[in-house]
Curated annotation (Swiss-Prot):
Covalent link Glycyl lysine isopeptide (Lys-Gly) (interchain with G-Cter in SUMO2), residues: K24
Subcellular localization, as worded in the UniProt entry: Nucleus; Cytoplasm
Key words, A-Z: Acetylation, Cytoplasm, Isopeptide bond, Metal-binding, mRNA processing, mRNA splicing, mRNA transport, Nucleus, Phosphoprotein, Repeat, Repressor, RNA-binding, Transport, Ubl conjugation, Zinc, Zinc-finger
Annotated region (Sufficient for interaction with NXF1), positions in chain: 81-98
Glycoprotein listed as a keyword: no
Organism for this UniProt entry: Homo sapiens (Human)
Protein name as annotated: Serine/arginine-rich splicing factor 7
Gene Ontology process terms (BP): cellular response to leukemia inhibitory factor; mRNA cis splicing, via spliceosome; mRNA processing; mRNA transport; negative regulation of mRNA splicing, via spliceosome; RNA splicing
GO molecular function, one term: RNA binding
SMART domains: RRM
Length: 238
């Protein structure tokens, strides 16, 4: 939930200079007199401070006025709004700062003699956070730039390789198709005239030789008796 109430004021109160044996019940009894509470949180490491959150910012302001400098949990506490000063518009004059008290403790480290905005631990945390944020931002920018460059290089290197491989495949397939079609046409459909003539001659020659061998030999004239005719010799004249 928001730390600001419906009237726009601060609802969380800082309680400083608490003893090590401060209890949650004592704080609730002391601050609930001014209004209903939301949460009560007591620091343990380092100890010495607490935060009390009200439901209404006006109750928080009343608690600051009534309990600041009072003895709670066996020690004189310092009570103020968690921002250190009440919320104001930009046209209001900044209120006068509270005079420094050497007995006040810092709620960041628990030591006396300074406040949280002057704490060396708080300054270190702010520096480490700013450095980590700047480092992460620069790292993210470098990573995004290197990634975009690598993508551009990959796309450039991949496109000529793909185009070359595709052109080589197409040329090879076209040459194979041409060679196959040429061999089929030459073997089946397109024969040279010299081959056809030689085949026709080789086929016709044995037929002529067979016809000659089968043709009957010249017939000899025979007599009806079967013996060859002889010319009659002239009869002798006795």
């Amino acid at each position: 939930m928001s730390r600001y109430g419906r009237y726009g004021g601060e609802t969380k109160v800082y309680v400083g200079n608490l003893g090590t044996g401060a209890g949650k019940g004592e704080l609730e009894r002391a601050f609930s007199y001014y209004g209903p509470l939301r949460t009560v949180w007591i620091a343990r490491n380092p100890p010495g401070f607490a935060f009390v959150e009200f439901e209404d910012p006006r109750d928080a302001e009343d608690a600051v006025r009534g309990l600041d400098g009072k003895v709670i949990c066996g020690s004189r506490v310092r009570v103020e709004l968690s921002t250190g000063m009440p919320r104001r518009s930009r046209f209001d004059r900044p209120p006068a700062r509270r005079p420094f008290d050497p007995n006040d403790r810092c709620y960041e480290c628990g030591e006396k003699g300074h406040y949280a905005y002057d704490c060396h631990r708080y300054s270190r945390r702010r520096r480490s956070r700013s450095r980590s944020r700047s480092h992460s931002r620069s790292r993210g920018r470098r990573y995004s730039r290197s990634r975009s460059r690598s993508r551009g290089r990959r796309s450039r290197s991949a496109s000529p390789r793909r185009s070359r491989s595709i052109s080589l495949r197409r040329s090879r397939s076209a040459s194979l198709r041409r060679s196959r079609s040429g061999s089929i046409k030459g073997s089946r459909y397109f024969q040279s005239p010299s081959r056809s003539r030689s085949r026709s001659r080789s086929i016709s020659r044995p037929r002529s030789s067979r016809s000659k061998s089968r043709s009957p030999s010249p017939k000899r004239s025979r007599s009806p008796s079967g013996s060859p005719r002889r010319s009659a010799s002239p009869e002798r004249m006795d």
